[in-house]
């Protein structure tokens, strides 16, 4: 959250004075709001790498690594780690408020039922070298998902936004399936189908490590640890990946491409 300060900053250009408001963040950070600079003066600011520029107003997360502070939507990470789960925190990050139980149950059910990918996507893995970087494979496969859901990836902003809830849940679900398949491809192992009777992280570990002779269903300790790890990394403020996604999505790209 931010608020406008009564203070203003004056910039003098070509013998003309221009005043700009000061914005104060919830943690006391101060910024100059120069959004009207070009319209007023014809000038723009140059700040290579955005080292001194806030790219947007955000209410999603706050990080102060030096002081060990992390908040998602205003909730301290310690509180979420003790009382929440990754999927509940993901819902919180996306929609701004902790969901009621019925809403959370519906969201979790949608995620659980969306883990499988079309069998024809299995053949995509034949085109990757065994030494290909996992992130290159993951990004390629996620982008390919859009071709299987044309109604969600039309690049028509209004149409794609009307499917946002379903698309977001689908991607949260399938990213673990694709990650597990990528790992097993690189290890030369057969793919393992998802089991929607398991938890989000339990199913991911199952798809990663189960074998025909060993079904890893009882691994609550590892599953809970992984859930906590994902919860901690649910959002990371305005880092490179977030900024890139914001830039791509602002052009109207669908959620799969973003």
Residue ranges and their predicted role:
Residues 2-258:
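Hydrophobic alpha-helical bundle cores within soluble ligand-binding/oligomerization subdomains
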């Amino acid at each position: 959250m931010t608020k406008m300060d009564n203070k203003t900053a004056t910039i003098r250009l070509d013998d003309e004075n221009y005043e700009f408001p000061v914005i104060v963040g919830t943690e006391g950070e101060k910024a100059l709001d120069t959004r009207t600079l070009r319209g007023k003066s014809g000038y723009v600011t140059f700040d290579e790498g955005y080292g001194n520029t806030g790219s947007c107003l955000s209410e999603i997360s706050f990080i102060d690594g030096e002081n060990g502070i992390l908040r998602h939507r205003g909730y301290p990470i310690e509180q979420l780690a003790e009382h929440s789960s990754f999927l509940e925190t993901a819902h919180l990050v996306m929609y701004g408020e902790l969901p009621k139980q019925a809403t959370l149950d519906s969201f979790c059910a949608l995620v659980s039922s969306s883990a499988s990918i079309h069998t024809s996507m299995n053949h995509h893995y034949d085109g990757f070298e065994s030494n290909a970087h996992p992130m290159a494979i993951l990004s390629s496969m996620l982008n390919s998902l859009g071709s299987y859901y044309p109604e969600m990836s039309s690049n028509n902003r209004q149409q794609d936004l009307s499917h946002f809830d379903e698309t977001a849940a689908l991607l949260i679900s399938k990213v673990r399936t694709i990650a597990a398949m990528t790992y097993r491809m690189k290890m030369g192992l057969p793919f393992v189908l998802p089991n929607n009777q398991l938890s989000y992280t339990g199913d991911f570990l199952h798809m990663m490590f189960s074998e025909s002779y060993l079904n890893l269903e009882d691994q609550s300790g590892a599953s809970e640890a992984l859930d906590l790890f994902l919860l901690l990394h649910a959002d990371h403020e305005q880092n490179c990946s977030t900024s890139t996604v914001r830039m791509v999505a602002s052009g109207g790209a669908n959620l799969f491409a973003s």
